[in-house]
Structures are given as C-alpha cells and as structure tokens.
Amino acid sequence: MTATKHTTIEAARETLDRAVERLLALQHPDGHWKGELETNVTIDAEDLFLRHYLGLLDERTATATATWIRSRQRDDGSFATFFGGPPDLSTTVEAYVGLRLAGDQPDAEHLQRARTAIDQLGGLEATRVFTRMWLSLLGLWSWSTVPPLPPEQMYLPKRAPLSIYSFGCWARQTIVALQIATTLRPVRPVDFTIDELARGTAAPRPLLDRILHGYARHPLRPLRRRALRTSVNWVIDRQEADGSWGGIQPPWVWSLIALREYGLPLDHPVLAKGLAGLDTFTLEDELGRRIEACQSPVWDTVLALIALLDAGVERDHPAVARAAEWLVAREVTIRGDWAVRRPKLAPGGFPFEYANDNYPDIDDTAEVVMALRRSGVGEDAADRAVAWLLGMQSSNDGWAAFDVDNDSSLPRRLPFCDFGEVTDPPSADVTAHVLEALGQEGRADDPAVRRGLDRLLAEQEADGSWFGRWGANYVYGTGAAVPALAACGLRDHPAVRRAVAWLTSVQNEDGGFGEDLRSYRDPAWRARGTSTASQTAWAILALHAAGSDGAVTEAAVRFLVDTQTPDGGWDEPFFTGTGFPGDFYLNYHLYRLVFPVSALGRIVNGERAG
C-alpha cells in the first residue's frame, strides 16, 4: 500500500466512524429509520386543492403551505420538478393556483413573475391532463375537456391489454379513483379566476379522447351504475392500515375525492382514516408546511442496516438487532394485486412504506433478504422472500418493481396517461438487486439466475453503463449492476471492465461523481452534474465490487472525506432518486448518509481484510 493510499484509508476510517455515529443517532427507538422524502410543490399545492374541495382548508394550513411553496420558486418565476432543474409548466401553474388559494394576490411580484414564466412555457392550455383535472375540481377548467376514464374498464378481462392490471400499481390505483372522479365530475369553485394564464388556443383532441367523451355522454346507464359501484368497492378494498392507498399521494388524494363525491360522508370510517393518515405525511418547520408524496421507512431501514454491517458494526449490536426485528415484522403475508399474474405463488415480499400490504415491492424485498441474512435474524422470512423473488421473475428474465410482465405499450398511449410512467416493466437496477441477493444466497448457477444475468448483460449500454430506472441515472444503474455481477461470480467479465472504464471516464475533477436528472431526457447530461455524496458512493460500490481500488476509487473516497459535514453527514440538495423518469423525482434525505457509509465501510474493511 502506498503512503498516499494509507493516508486516504485512515481518513476514510475516521470519516466512516463519524458517519456511523450520525446514522445510529437517527435510528428510532423501535429500530427503524425514516428520512424525509422530498419531491416538488405540486404535492403541496394539491394538498390545498384537496382540503378546499373537502371544506377542510384553514388559514393556518394555507399560510404555512404557501410559505413553503414560495421558498421553492426559481429566480425566473417558475417552479421545477427537482432542485436546480429547468422550469416546468404544470408545476408552475399548480404552484400559482395554490398560492392564489392561500390568499396571495395576483399583483404580487412573485406571482407576476410566475405568470410571465407560464406564458413563456406555453400557457394554461399546454399543461398536463393531471393538472387540468385539479383545475376542474376547483372550477377553473371544464371537466368536459378532460379525457374521461370509463369505469366500465373494470370489466375488461384481467389479462386484457387495457385492463387496470396492465397499468403499474401506482397508476392502477389512481386510474380507478379517477374513473369515479371523471364520471361524477366533482367541483368546488374557488373565488378567483386564472384567465390571465390562458392563451386561448387549446390543442386538438385525439380521436380516442373524442370517442371516450362520446360514450361518456351516452353510456349504457345500468352498466355505468354497476361499473361505478365496482370501482368504488375496488378502491375501498385497497385502503391500507395507515389510511393510505398504496402509501403514495396520487391514488390517496383522488380516492378521497372520488369516495366523497360518490356520497361517503367525511366521518365515514374510510374517509376519516384516510384523512388522519394523510396528516402523518405532513412536515412543518421554519421553512413552512409540506407534504411527503410517499414515506420510505422499509427502504431507509434496510439500506441503513446494510450500511452499518458494511461499516463493521457487529450483528449482535443492539441497533442491528432492533433494525432486523423491525424489518421481519414488515413482511407481507397476504396476496395483493401481484397475484393476478402469479395466483399460485405464496406471499413473502416486503413493502417500501409503513403499510402497503397490497403492493410489496421486489427491490425492497431483495435488499431485505441481504440484510436479514447478514444480521442473522429472520431466516424463515428471508427464505419466503427468496421464493417470492424467484416467482416474480418476468418472462423477459428481468425483474420489475411490483408486478410480472407489466410491460404493455398500449396504456401509455391513452390520452389521460401524461402524468408519468404508467407501466412497470423490468428494469436493470431492480434486476441487479435481485441478482445480487440471489448471488449472495449461493444461487448463481440456478437457471433463473443465469437467465437474469443474461438479461442484465444484454441491457448494458454501448458505453459500458446501465440505465437507472429508480435512481439518477446511469451512475445508479451501473452502481447496482456491477455488484450484482460480482456477487454472481462475474467480477472478471468484460462487461464489468467496460463499466469500470466508463466510470473512470465520467469522474468529476473533484473526485466525485454526479449526474443531473436531465439525463433522462437529454443524453448530453449522461453522468454530468455536480458531484454528490450518494452518486459518488454508488460509483465506489461498483468500482470496489469490480476489484478496482486504484486512483479513481481513491479520489472518490477522498471526495467523501473532504465534503463530510461536522455532524457526520453530507449536504445534498440535489435529487438523486427517481419516481417517473422525465416527470417525477425524489430527494431521499438518508441517501446522502447510508450510501457513503456502505461505500466507505467496504473500502475500509476491504483494506483491513487484505
């Protein structure tokens, strides 16, 4: 070992110790971790819209939420979908309307700037369908021009190309709620207009939209009534224990609206439970009041547990034991929508959220398997999880997030599907995490694993990287793929060497790695961006798994050492999580800590072992 490398390792060890101390301090007494999950101001504005419709919006809530929304405005008056991102029309319109609803006057300087931005971005008519649905709820747009979602869709065979089960679970839940809403067309008018945002030129409506509107005007009445009731029952049946629908904001708020418009009173147990649960997603501090679009306690906890184990914390440490036991208790033991395509498969998955029994996810389950095996807790639960993972392999040999073979191209062509990704095809990053778990299980020679490896290798980009569906972006995908290949005995595969060469070529001058979320729409941004702690850690994890602990890795480690904050963490305002590529992004506030701990832990302990 060179003197320089020895110095770097010693500095990494000190940095790691501080980070571990910080991570342990953030653990909840029952053993779990939960970091803030930051998104964009549409979630906060829509909370105001929901509460206005339900008659529950009070001045304090409106004022505190408006404070947060104003703090996110860009200098040019617009709002973005992620920190440092470009202006986004629909986000800016929803923020503008939310601020008006909170009492901000149209002649206020910040709203004048927002209006200018909206005009430059295309005006009110160019907003997404989802935004126009919210405006229709407030009486600021007409439901008659919004694409309807016929509840009769519920009667399509489950395996039909456009059945609700051909949509990803997040879209499926939202669409069923919107079947009710677009049929009943709820409106609670606000006391202002937004005519100043309109240009007066609407885009032509596609043929399918016109057909759906034609049927909506003249439906088969008895069938429509039965279908509406079927949609209502489907929604009610899928409410989770915490009051949510899928643990995520879009189906949650639209389910509340749909059920209220259908006639359920606010004190109905379903609505009361849903509203009470929504309050637990509220954060308020000196920056204002904001809503989490989702909460990620299982994901945060399993990543934190793996990080501690990577850092050398012993499995009998109380923090490790508490975390593992908490995870075991989150096992999903019932069949959810995934059983539509796997009716004979026994349950065994784990959710992302506190409560999501209907939709356990494959990514979390793979990570939980690795964490439980290493912690020596929950062996039976891990066995069931492995069986469930093997059973959830898609026909293209990869793994998706929630479903099997949910990859039809038809749903995204529908006129109301412009609010983000609506299907759940297998992705390289989820496939990689499953393969890493199965490789650690000693199953590298299983036929299912070999097929999965072939799938992962086939998805490598020409430059040596992998696309990241659930994290930003090619750095994330590559950071997942290389450890998976190594875990399955392919560390010396040419694909791994190409990945190392690619990572070497995209390292920033400061030693870190960064990738702007614009890379999802513009290839020029691939692996380009300000260095972040989480993305640098992903690169280190890949390089270390590949056996490449030379100058590139050393510089990346030095970046983490040099940028650590006094509290043992790292500053990271940049979003490195992905909800819908190109449309919706996430800033997991624990990513900036758990991934550096894992990366530094593997480097430091690798040196010790060597």
Where are the regions that the model predicts?
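Preference for long, amphipathic alpha-helical scaffolds in soluble/luminal domains
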Residues: M1-G610
